[in-house]
Amino acid sequence: MKGIICFALVFTFATSVFAAALSGTVHFSGTAPAPQRVDMNADPTCASAHTEPVYADDVVVNSNNTLKNVFVYVKTGLEGKTFETPPNLVVLDQKGCKYEPHVFGIQVNQPLEIRNSDPTLHNVHGMPKETKEFNLGMPIQGMKLTRKFD
């Protein structure tokens, strides 16, 4: 894929002179890759969940050349500063045999709830770089499991 990704970032200063909220838009230039169709026929439940074709969410270029499902993180934070882990639950749901949301951020020790909203077996295989890998079968619709990355 030949293309250039440009970041347009906006900084909004919070109450502290040294803290800021970061938001922005990621633009794609060049020829957008063709969407890759996902074959849902391996599981009849998944196939019947969709009346329209399903496409992979790996690279999604919107009509205005912005990218969907982009995550930007700050690799090195403020020196000498530590911040508490947000207590709010991050939810990863399997709906229509697709993960929702496709991309999300989570901090160390922040709870992740993994849900299966489908009436079929799903497998969730987490492969974090720094912590223990997990591979969970979720055979029951409505099933919920909670994990933390430490």
Residues of each region from the PLM?
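Sec/Tat signal peptide C-region and signal peptidase I cleavage site
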Residues: 13-19
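Positively charged n-region of N-terminal signal peptides that target proteins for export
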Residues: 1-9
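Extracytoplasmic copper-binding redox domains, predominantly the cupredoxin/blue-copper superfamily
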Residues: 19-150
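Hydrophobic alpha-helical segments and their boundary regions
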Residues: 8-9, 13, 98
